[in-house]
């Protein structure tokens, strides 16, 4: 209902920063797959200082947990000056970005207490999936089976996470002593796992104060592999999809 009265954009620019930018990158894959919509993720602090080319039928989606991120707010204002429709995806109700946007979708995740965004980031990803499903259906490109399966998977997600957390904590406790002395980490991902690799590296930096870099798996051979040594941990995010064999190849 938040975007139901707005036209379907010919191109969507997702403008965000940090965790929100990674959520936007992840959403790009879903929008391209389900809605066949051209999507350009933009880092807010870069977007606002470029001589950006925006068309009147472009739409801008700005993502911010706080709704007060200065660079994202400035990018929103720039887009509106150029005549673009602007949608805000925010968590804090009544903050500056939602007030200035043409439409707003609230994640309603509650106050974000931790330094590293957790529930806000997860909520943004869920909303991005719903947006992709909505536009895919509205454009008549998404079959009912895919939509129903995706919605059922989203409904089952809380239970899946709850069931998986004990084993994940146990694994983390087992691995942490092995890698506690490491000075750098790589996080690798391909396709829609790449934004999550970037997010994993950011989380390690924010929480543990350890240097980490996220890379697209295929980019390893173009320089970063030169840094790999026996005591350089690498985490590979490899989903069980068509890219799985390829990810294993680069990981090995």
Would you name each region that the model predicts?
Residues 2-19, 25, 39-40:
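Pre-Walker A segment
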Residues 20-26, 68-75, 97, 193-198, ...:
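Short glycine/serine/threonine-rich phosphate/pyrophosphate-binding segments
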Residues 250-251:
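Conserved small/polar residues in nucleotide/adenosyl-binding loops
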């Amino acid at each position: 209902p938040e975007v139901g009265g707005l036209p379907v954009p010919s191109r969507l620019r997702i403008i965000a920063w940090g965790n929100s930018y990674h959520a936007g990158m992840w959403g790009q894959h879903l929008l391209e797959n389900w809605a066949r919509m051209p999507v350009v993720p933009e880092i807010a602090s870069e977007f606002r200082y470029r001589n950006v080319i925006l068309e009147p039928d472009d739409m801008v989606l700005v993502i911010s947990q706080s709704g007060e991120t200065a660079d994202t707010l400035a990018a929103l204002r720039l887009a509106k000056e150029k005549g673009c429709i602007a949608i805000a995806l925010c968590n804090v109700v009544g903050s500056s970005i939602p007030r200035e946007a043409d439409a707003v979708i609230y994640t309603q995740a509650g106050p974000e207490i931790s330094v590293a965004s957790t529930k806000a980031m997860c909520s943004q990803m869920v909303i991005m999936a719903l947006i992709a499903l909505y536009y895919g259906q509205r454009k008549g490109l998404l079959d009912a089976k895919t939509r129903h399966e995706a919605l059922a998977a989203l409904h089952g997600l809380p239970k899946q996470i709850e069931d998986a957390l004990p084993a994940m904590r146990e694994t983390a406790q087992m691995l942490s002593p092995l890698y506690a002395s490491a000075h750098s980490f790589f996080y690798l991902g391909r396709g829609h796992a790449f934004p999550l690799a970037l997010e994993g590296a950011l989380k390690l930096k924010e929480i543990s104060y350890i240097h980490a870099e996220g890379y697209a798996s295929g980019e390893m051979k173009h320089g970063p592999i030169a840094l790999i040594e026996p005591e350089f941990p690498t985490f590979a995010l490899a989903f069980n999809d068509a890219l799985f064999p390829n990810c294993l190849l680069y990981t090995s």
